[in-house]
């Protein structure tokens, strides 16, 4: 196991948990703490990436561009990263983000749709950025299939491709198998992004590292979507115990989590019933509220809806299946 590069995504994935209400002061405080603790890359955007601030995804209290500028000014050593989802972020937003200090672009697609990212990788490379591919909902497809999708991203110019456990659905063996498949196929680096819906954020990250992952993600205090992410301070402590600390100040990260992030958190992400259901079913977290609403209307347990959606391997954008599945469950109940 080699010492990995850590990207802290408190100010991006954590935006979901904060309902996109980060302030300039929050960014200054968090970036300063992470930078002093030796974190090399800090991701800053709306939870759904550049241009994510919208009626559909939730409006940001402060614009991405202003937060990115604050981050760049606050960081003495760390590089500033941004997330971009094809179909949401465009060249205009990316160009503006680069002008304000973005140096690393992470381009995220569903794990079945790497082909839609070609233009975005080339655009980022033309702007001189380091590029990272994000294969979201990676648990949905086999290691071999993921490797093929990752190969596309590599061919478009990705410097690293991540296995992304968006739903927190993987077991350690799943994380290891997918990372290993990418390592066996790609020439570029491989990363792993964990969520904690089944309580396995740290365990899955360790399994990914043992399988050869070069880059990993964390959030201070685990602040992120669903049940949260692998906690940056925990990752630092574990890496140090394993003898592969990449230069992180463990105590400083513990203090950052406790004194900088914890006081501003609206709640502590935790594997509660809803979060466990998402991880157990293996569906995207945006399905939850829709399933609850439809379930209440039709008298169907929303967990049954989500589990069936997971069995059918639905991905983001297929929310219309929720009603169909609920109606099928009603018909089955009536026939019983």
Curated annotation (Swiss-Prot):
PROSITE patterns: PYR_CT. Belongs to the 4-hydroxy-2-oxovalerate aldolase family. It comes from the Bacteria. Its EC number is 4.1.3.39. This is 4-hydroxy-2-oxovalerate aldolase. Residues 4-254 form the Pyruvate carboxyltransferase domain. It comes from Roseiflexus castenholzii (strain DSM 13941 / HLO8). One of its GO terms (biological process) is catabolic process. GO terms for molecular function: 2-isopropylmalate synthase activity; 4-hydroxy-2-oxovalerate aldolase activity; manganese ion binding. The keyword Lyase applies. Substrate binds at residues 12-13, 166, 193, 284. InterPro entries: 2-IPM_HCS-like, 4OH_2_O-val_aldolase, Aldolase_TIM, DmpG_comm, DRE_TIM_HOA, PYR_CT. It is an enzyme of class 4 (lyase). Transmembrane segments: none annotated. It catalyses: (S)-4-hydroxy-2-oxopentanoate = acetaldehyde + pyruvate. The record marks 12 as: Transition state stabilizer. Keywords: Aromatic hydrocarbons catabolism, Lyase, Manganese, Metal-binding. The active site is at residue 16. Mn(2+) binds at residues 13, 193, 195. NCBIfam families: 4OH_2_O_val_ald, PRK08195.1. Pfam families: DmpG_comm, HMGL-like.
